[in-house]
């Protein structure tokens, strides 16, 4: 396992440009490894806003991480050589960070009347009930946001619904998510890509943190770049004040997203 390594490898290939892949790519680069980060999609963190992907990739590349966005890995040879669409890359270690799949096969769920999707995620409603209303499912196996805090929220709702009044609901739309890179990334709700696909009418409000006086002083003393100070985008339902989604990139983004979650 990756977390059982006792020495920092000279080079490492990381497959997957999601939150875990980006976080560990930056960590390993700072520890001294030559890092190759592969993502089949055109951008890192493909589920997030485009400005997040651009800013994060730029930051990683400034630190020496070689980012292979839009470069699908075709195979691995000898446990050390990555063969991708762009070429061949030899690394001392390879980390696969391509997400999780449910381990539900063989549980006999179909015999219990529990339906699953094609991948094996049990189908659940807003109260966490499967298609067998006496059986609940929570956590990563459901295929929803695979975050510790989301599973915790599901567990609290499960206790309420299974043992007491069946009234608790869990909404992934109001569950925040963070990626602990530098700059830090945090988001909640929908992105512009999602709303465009849904043809939802919305208005966009944006703000660069370096427009704040406090940041301007820090910028003069530290000589940092503008994108390092942060940027926020808030999406609001057109003609109203309902927040549909928000994204922040910058220092303490995971903390700064909290008021927006409350407002939603």
Task: Report each predicted region and the residues it spans.
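FAD-site-proximal beta/loop scaffold in flavoenzymes
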Residues: 1-9, 89-164
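Rossmann-like dinucleotide-binding cores of NAD(P)H-dependent redox enzymes
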Residues: 3-4, 9-13, 19-78, 145-152, ...
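Glycine/Thr-rich phosphate-binding loops of Rossmann-like dinucleotide-binding domains
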Residues: 23-24, 45, 103-106, 145, ...
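A Rossmann-like FAD-binding core segment of flavoenzymes
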Residues: 31-126, 190, 197, 201, ...
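A short alpha-helix-loop-beta-strand transition element characteristic
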Residues: 115-117, 165-176, 200-205
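Flexible, glycine-rich terminal cap/loop adjacent to redox cofactors
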Residues: 163, 180-191, 196-264
């Amino acid at each position: 396992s990756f977390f059982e390594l006792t020495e920092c490898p000279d080079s490492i290939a990381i497959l997957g440009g999601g939150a875990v892949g980006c976080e560990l790519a930056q960590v390993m680069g700072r520890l001294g490894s030559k890092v190759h980060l592969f993502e089949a999609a055109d951008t890192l963190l493909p589920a997030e806003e485009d400005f997040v992907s651009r800013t994060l990739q730029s930051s990683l590349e400034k630190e020496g991480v070689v980012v292979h966005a839009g470069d699908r890995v075709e195979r691995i040879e000898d446990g050390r050589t990555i063969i991708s669409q762009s070429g061949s890359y030899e690394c001392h270690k390879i980390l696969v960070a391509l997400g999780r799949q449910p381990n539900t096969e063989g549980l006999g769920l179909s015999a219990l009347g529990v339906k699953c999707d094609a991948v094996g995620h049990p189908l659940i409603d807003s109260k966490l009930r499967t298609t067998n209303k006496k059986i609940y499912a929570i956590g990563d196996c459901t295929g929803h946001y695979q975050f510790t805090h989301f599973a915790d929220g599901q567990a609290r709702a499960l206790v309420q619904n299974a043992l007491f009044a069946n009234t608790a609901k869990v909404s992934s739309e109001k569950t925040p998510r963070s990626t602990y890179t530098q700059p830090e990334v945090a988001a909640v709700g929908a992105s512009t890509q999602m709303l465009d696909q849904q043809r939802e009418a919305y208005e966009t409000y944006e703000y660069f943190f370096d427009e704040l006086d406090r940041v301007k002083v820090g910028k003069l003393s530290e000589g940092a770049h503008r994108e390092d100070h942060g940027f926020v985008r808030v999406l609001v339902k057109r003609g109203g004040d309902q927040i549909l989604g928000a994204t922040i990139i910058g220092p303490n983004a995971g903390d700064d997203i909290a008021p927006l979650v409350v407002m939603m």
